[in-house]
Amino acid sequence: MNWSIPNILTVLRLLAAPGVAVMFLYFHRPWADWFALTLFILAAVTDFFDGYLARLWKQESKFGAMLDPIADKAMVVIALVIITGYSGMNPWLILPVTLILFREVFVSGLREFLGAKASLLKVTKLAKWKTTAQMVAIAILFLGTGLEHLEGIARQGMTWEQYARAVSAGEADPIRSCGMHGCSSYATWLGLALIWIAAALTFITGWDYFRKALPYLKDEK
């Protein structure tokens, strides 16, 4: 294996995936949320640079091509499981997350079944946009969980209406509130909208891969 900089970035991104979960094991919230968000964003940035540098420096390799989608899937799956757990099992989050996880398992199974023919299921531009949408949505959802925990601390038992009045009166920290429902609500709803968009792209790309693999799934007569 060639330990080029692009390959090292890919390996680091793969290691960052379980690292996001580790943040919640060793740190209390909201620090765990902020550390997980920071680590996730840094890892997501490497997803752009490893491929870009590999093409720029002509260091593309089979190892990098194999590991890159695995690192992406590991990041997305682990992060979504964590966010879903800390969201209180919000059904508006569970549905798109279930679709995303099902698609990832399904496509991975297709690739394994096709074996040498798996090269037919090349990563498309739409699939890259799908991954980007997933990562942006996850980052915003992590932001929402962190802000929600901070606002819970800042409110100290107040209702949102009481908290909003306290902010207006200068008796509460305005940085932790964007109005009646707080910053976390805006971040969470934006993240949910993006994760539904990502789920739609996930379904479309999954169907495209299945359509391409279908001729090889028929029994020979």
UniProtKB/Swiss-Prot annotation:
Family annotation (InterPro entries): CDP-alcohol_PTase-I (IPR050324), CDP-OH_P_trans (IPR000462), CDP-OH_PTrfase_TM_dom (IPR043130), CDP_ALCOHOL_P_TRANSF_CS (IPR048254), Phosphatidylglycerol_P_synth (IPR004570)
CC annotations in GO: plasma membrane
Gene Ontology molecular functions: CDP-diacylglycerol-glycerol-3-phosphate 3-phosphatidyltransferase activity
Bilayer topology: Multi-pass membrane protein
UniProt GO BP: phosphatidylglycerol biosynthetic process
Name of a matching Pfam family: CDP-OH_P_transf
Keyword Transferase among UniProt keywords: yes
Pathway the protein contributes to: Phospholipid metabolism; phosphatidylglycerol biosynthesis; phosphatidylglycerol from CDP-diacylglycerol: step 1/2
Membrane-spanning ranges: 8-28, 34-54, 75-95, 133-153, 187-207
PROSITE patterns registered for this protein in UniProt: CDP_ALCOHOL_P_TRANSF
Taxonomic superkingdom: Bacteria
PANTHER family hit by this protein: CDP-DIACYLGLYCEROL--GLYCEROL-3-PHOSPHATE 3-PHOSPHATIDYLTRANSFERASE 1, CHLOROPLASTIC, CDP-DIACYLGLYCEROL--GLYCEROL-3-PHOSPHATE 3-PHOSPHATIDYLTRANSFERASE-RELATED
Function: This protein catalyzes the committed step to the synthesis of the acidic phospholipids.
Family named by the database record: Belongs to the CDP-alcohol phosphatidyltransferase class-I family.
Protein name as annotated: CDP-diacylglycerol--glycerol-3-phosphate 3-phosphatidyltransferase
